[in-house]
Amino acid sequence: MGWDAIWVPEATNRNALVNATLLLGATEKLVVATGIAPIHNRDAMASANGQRTLDEAFPGRFLFGLGVSHQWLVEDVRGGTYTKPLPTMRRYLEAMHAAPFSAHPPSMRGRTVIAALGPKMLALSGELADGAHPYLVAPEHTAGARAILGPGKILAPDQKLVLETD
């Protein structure tokens, strides 16, 4: 189809890491990104090692998008406890970075972006991740997000549009 990348969601549907594996295995150049995998769906070590496994098998073709999800999904659907998003995401990313991996490490470190809208989460995206994936933002949001992230970080805003001739 001529696409360079595809983003696969995860909330109450298919497992994003499994979907990413299937798509990466069926293509040769396509970059597959999770947009967004909730951190409450798996612990930090499972996420880190899943990412490392995909990076080993498909170097440079997987982008791990992570987010804190929504309180109702975490508590009412998953039966978990929703805590303050910023410190929760910080602890999760730090735990991912520290997670042991006994297998042969991939040749390159995997890339991670986080769902970030506000200035504090955007700053965390620049500090502990490779960038941000702001969801449903106006075009004006992008300039401010770039200023917070700084150059060299991934900024992948999700902006909806309607193609119409009327």
Protein language model annotation of sequence segments:
Residues 12-14, 68, 118:
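Short glycine-enriched loops at secondary-structure junctions
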Residues 108, 113-121, 128:
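Internal, conserved structured core segments that host functional sites
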Residues 11-14, 37-42, 81:
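Glycine-rich "substrate-gating" loop/helix at the edge of Rossmann-like oxidoreductase active sites
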Residues 4-8, 31-35, 62-66, 112-115, ...:
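Hydrophobic faces of well-ordered beta-strands that scaffold small-molecule active sites
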Residues 12-22, 136-151:
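Active-site-adjacent beta->alpha loops and helix N-cap segments on the catalytic face
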